[in-house]
């Protein structure tokens, strides 16, 4: 049965699973309805501007402080916080898809860190990961104190059971889990694989539209936030926390997903990438890829993001006398790309769904030789329909440091550079 959601981005939501569970006219009454506890979850400073402020009030069966002391957790062996301090290769890197696990593995233990920059101490930068799992989280829950988490499924459906309600997620949808929200990941199919980004910086939001106007790109109405849902379950559970890069576990005697009602702005949400209103040129030239931005995390430098999440969706190319694929590029920003389905229009082969590529600051990249030759002679008087595709990009202002396990991975394509070596010399000084 399909879940119900609240619609809109950044709304001050209010929802209750039992009638009258939300206090009226105040946040913390002397006694809450149904004998619940009031607890505030703050995602920004108390004094953050109203437009930036993220906080929610939760009305729950037990407050979040009810747990035994945390101890170090030895699991999540491939989820790393150390991106290294040594030299970073300027080479273009590409990986084949992460294999699905051969032994029982849930989401937390199935995360593999591929790179990142910054960290939670400075509240800036990103962690970039792949995940592969074949079982649901059983008897345990997780929260991330370090970062907001962006999930991009490539294979298999997920149910995110969170303190604030349920989110069902499938490939071509994304979800964002704010800092501190407790949850478990359930697999709705036998196997799951995808991408995970930790945003250590300012919370994600849709980009400003500027001269595009009041509509376009990811429209606010298409973001969906869960309605209140709870479980009142006692037993032996564990709560896993990610805190300053380390993993910790605390025993619980109850499920922490016991929020009966809540209101506020700090909440998980999902978005269907198929609703993205793609903007493009209807005259000439391929515009900058910033027009494909779904979500952005601003930095302290205006116009320069801590992170941009952009997609390259199905679209119609109508530009005339134009090289239509993405052009050759060297960028001050660093670009990590993934592919959810289909084929990326700048790479004829080698970039498979579930795979990834990394083009760091000023490392040249662009269409492969086959794509260039075909696009250079294509008939641009006719529109070209790109249908079977959904690529995405995590673009950051800082160099992305690939982890040792990513560089040592069997999925690293050592011959990636070869896709450009057949680009021919066409220069003829006698012919303009």
Curated annotation (Swiss-Prot):
Keywords: Dioxygenase, Iron, Metal-binding, Oxidoreductase, Phenylalanine catabolism, Tyrosine catabolism. It catalyses: homogentisate + O2 = 4-maleylacetoacetate + H(+). GO terms for molecular function: homogentisate 1,2-dioxygenase activity; iron ion binding. Its EC number is 1.13.11.5. One of its GO terms (biological process) is tyrosine catabolic process. Fe cation binds at residues 329, 335, 365. One of its GO terms (cellular component) is cytoplasm. The keyword Cytoplasm does not apply. Homogentisate binds at residues 344, 365. Hexamer; dimer of trimers. NCBIfam families: hmgA (TIGR01015). This is Homogentisate 1,2-dioxygenase. It comes from Bordetella avium (strain 197N). The gene is hmgA.
């Amino acid at each position: 049965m399909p879940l119900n959601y609240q619609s809109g981005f950044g709304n001050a939501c209010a929802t209750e699973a039992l009638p009258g569970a939300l206090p009226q006219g105040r946040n913390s009454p002397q006694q809450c309805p149904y004998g619940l506890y009031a607890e505030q979850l703050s995602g920004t400073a108390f004094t953050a501007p109203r437009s930036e402020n993220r906080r929610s009030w939760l009305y729950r069966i037990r407050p979040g402080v009810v747990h035994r002391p945390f101890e170090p957790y030895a699991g999540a062996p491939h989820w790393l916080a150390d991106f290294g301090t040594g030299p970073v290769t300027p080479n273009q890197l590409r990986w084949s898809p992460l294999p699905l696990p051969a032994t029982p593995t849930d989401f937390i233990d199935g995360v593999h860190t591929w790179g990142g920059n910054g960290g939670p101490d400075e509240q800036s930068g990103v962690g970039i990961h792949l995940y592969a799992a074949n079982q649901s989280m059983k008897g345990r829950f997780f929260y991330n104190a370090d970062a907001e988490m962006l999930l991009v499924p490539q294979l298999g459906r997920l149910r995110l059971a969170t303190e604030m309600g349920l989110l069902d997620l499938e490939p071509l949808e994304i979800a964002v889990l704010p800092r501190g929200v407790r949850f478990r990941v359930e697999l709705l199919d036998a196997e799951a694989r995808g991408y995970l980004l930790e945003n250590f910086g300012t919370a994600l939001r849709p980009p400003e539209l500027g001269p595009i106007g009041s509509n376009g790109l990811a429209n606010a109405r298409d973001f969906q936030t869960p309605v209140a849902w709870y479980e009142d379950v006692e037993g032996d559970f564990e709560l896993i926390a990610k805190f300053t890069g380390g993993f910790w576990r605390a025993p619980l005697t109850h499920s922490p997903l016991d929020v009966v009602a809540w209101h506020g702005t700090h909440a998980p949400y999902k978005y269907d990438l198929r609703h993205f209103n793609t903007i493009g040129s209807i005259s000439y030239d391929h515009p900058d890829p910033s027009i494909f931005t779904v979500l952005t995390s601003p930095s302290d430098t205006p116009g320069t993001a801590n992170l941009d999440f952009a997609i390259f969706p199905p679209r119609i190319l109508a530009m005339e006398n134009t090289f239509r694929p993405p052009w050759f590029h060297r960028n001050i920003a660093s670009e990590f790309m993934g592919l959810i389905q289909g084929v990326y229009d700048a790479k004829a082969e080698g970039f498979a769904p579930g795979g990834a590529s990394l083009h760091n600051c000023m490392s040249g990249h662009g269409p492969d030789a086959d794509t260039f030759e075909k696009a250079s002679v294509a008939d641009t008087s006719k529109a070209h329909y790109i249908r079977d595709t959904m690529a995405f990009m995590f673009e950051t202002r800082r160099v992305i440091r690939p982890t040792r396990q990513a560089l040592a991975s069997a999925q690293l394509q050592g011959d990636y550079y070869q896709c450009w070596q057949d680009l021919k010399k066409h220069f003829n000084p006698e012919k303009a």
